[in-house]
Amino acid sequence: MGNNLRRAAHRRLGLALVCLGVWRCAAEPAPRTGARDAALSYLLSRLSPFQSEGIYYELGEDRIRLSASPEGARFIPSFELPDDAPLYPVLTEYKRVFVYDAAVEVCALVLAGKHSEAKQLLRTIEAMQLLDGGLGFSFNASGDTFYNHSYLRSGTVAWAGYAAVLYGHETGETDFRAFAGRIAEWLERQQVPGDRLLDPRAGLIMGGHGQWAEDYSELTKGKRTWAGTEHAIDAYFFLRDYARSQQAPSMRSRYAAAADRVKRALLEQMWTEPAPGLGRFVQGVDRQSLNLGKALDCCGGWGALFLLAVGEREKAAATLAYTAETFATTFRPAEADEGVSVTGYRPYAGHNEGIDWDRYPDVVWSEGSLGVALSYLRLGRRDKFESIVDNMLKLCTVPGDPRSGVRYSRYRQDLAAGPKAPVDTATVIKDLTQAPSACCTAWLLLVLESAEEGNFGKFWGPDQ
């Protein structure tokens, strides 16, 4: 999320795209165990060997050298688009992988007990780690060596570290201890020092590095000094659990203190209550002022999960109430052959990301909707959890069947009316694709596995 919608670039097209997660829904609700197995089948069927000499380009003649891919490294392509789609050369032809997607896939596979496959994905993520400990946003995994290594987002880096820590906790292995340690040091350097009376960002995590031009034709390098709520939440869970994994008392206290600073900054600086019984986190802050944008991941998704984890149950209920009032929506197809109606949540409200989202009230964003579902489950509202899950199953390419992949989003302004239908790019909202997404399918699996008794609280669980 974060710059919520994930950006990608390609040397020939200079385009970018968003990727985020999703989960399940069914025209007629399928047995949830069957949906879980089907989502797992989708991911496992797309695992491919990752083979790279470790030399990558980004723009022009620049090159960086990283580690060659280790034995056993594998990847899952983030998107499946037909070869006549405008974004096919960017997302599908060279098997584009978004690092965030891969991290979500690792978490889902770990909870599903597929530790060997999770390790194979982590091997690939580890091979892409930069010398300073960070991770670029996305890379081509087959037939081309593009790596968006100057565009980093702290939330993505934190997710990769969290996936490694979760894997280590569940397996007892230490293979990725050094990898996670370098991420911890990188995030520590992004944490804003000082007192919030002097700097409203104090304690939060700066956004990362790099910024693409609006048309993705130019990349401005350098640190992004704004701090976003979503990145802070991602970093909190990683820093907290990384601290728990440390045996040395000095390391435990060092990173526990960093996590605590993030937690206090979020609760004291970013929380607002616009009306009685309603609450939310603002979207971010720079040196001068708060960004009051309305983003789903700062409210009923990531925000509510964070509040529940830190024991702020009343605030979690308030932000879910705000989410229902502000982001709930329904996609209704214009034609019968465009699928079925789906109720879920839109990514933004009001003006955000250069768009008036209130002009597009029917956008259903699957990843964010899944986060809301998991929040309701942990609040004890299994009825709401099941209702959202059943709706998300309708977002499968074949409604109700996760083996066909879960769409990234759904709305009337279709990216494509069908698998081989003509595409009118003018109808695409921002960078939201309606193609099936590996990350979205992984989110479905992650949420369903999190509902299992043996897994409850393993992912982004409560403070202890």
Give residue spans per PLM region.
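Extended ligand-binding clefts on enzyme/binding-domain cores
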Residues: 30-87, 92, 96-100, 127-130, ...
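Bacterial N-terminal signal peptides that target proteins for export
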Residues: 2-13
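Non-membrane alpha-helical segments in proteins
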Residues: 100-112, 120-124, 159-163
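Bacterial N-terminal signal peptides
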Residues: 12-21
